[in-house]
């Protein structure tokens, strides 16, 4: 009987230690935004792509985030692709299953181009995430970016502001 009691106490103690370790891993899971850069390219520089995006918005097959559907489309030279590259760091001892980003639009922004690539971050690693929006050419690149990550099926998010 005494041996079973010792085994039970040891098992419960081991279980508690494991729960504390798993809790520590989960609670310290954090994705940090290390750097954000932006580049603007005229939509006229890739006219075919602009026309494909425009056609997909008009016929309702656009895959991405449509902020607003223009009533009257202007020439491609009146729009700019703003590309944001976000440098992320996974500070956790567990890999991040999936990472995605959304740009919080300003009035006038048209759409965010969808990405079907599943991006993840290995444990204690860094990586880049790129998002692209279509906006009027006279806009500024200052935007809020929301990075959402998933660890063991639970989501977390980080907000950052590009520019000022």
Where are the regions a protein language model picked out?
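Low-complexity, acidic Ser/Thr/Pro/Gly-rich terminal tails and inter-domain linkers that flank the onset
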Residues: 26-80, 106-108
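Asparagine-centered strand-capping/turn motif at beta-strand->loop junctions
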Residues: 86-92
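Hydrophobic beta-strand segments
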Residues: 99-103
């Amino acid at each position: 009987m005494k041996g079973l009691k010792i085994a039970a106490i040891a098992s419960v103690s081991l279980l508690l230690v494991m729960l504390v370790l798993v809790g520590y891993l989960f609670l310290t899971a954090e994705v940090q935004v290390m750097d954000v850069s932006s580049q603007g390219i005229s939509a006229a520089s890739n006219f075919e792509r602009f026309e494909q995006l425009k056609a997909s918005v008009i016929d309702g097959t656009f895959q991405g985030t449509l902020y607003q559907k223009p009533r009257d489309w202007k020439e491609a030279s009146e729009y700019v692709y703003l590309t944001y590259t976000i440098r992320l760091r996974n500070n956790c001892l567990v890999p991040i299953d999936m990472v995605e980003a959304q740009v919080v639009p300003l009035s006038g922004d048209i759409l965010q181009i969808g990405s079907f690539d599943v991006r993840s971050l290995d444990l204690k690693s860094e990586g880049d995430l790129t998002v692209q929006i279509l906006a009027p050419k006279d806009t500024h690149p200052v935007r809020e970016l929301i990075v959402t990550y998933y660890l063991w099926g639970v989501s977390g998010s980080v907000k950052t502001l590009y520019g000022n």
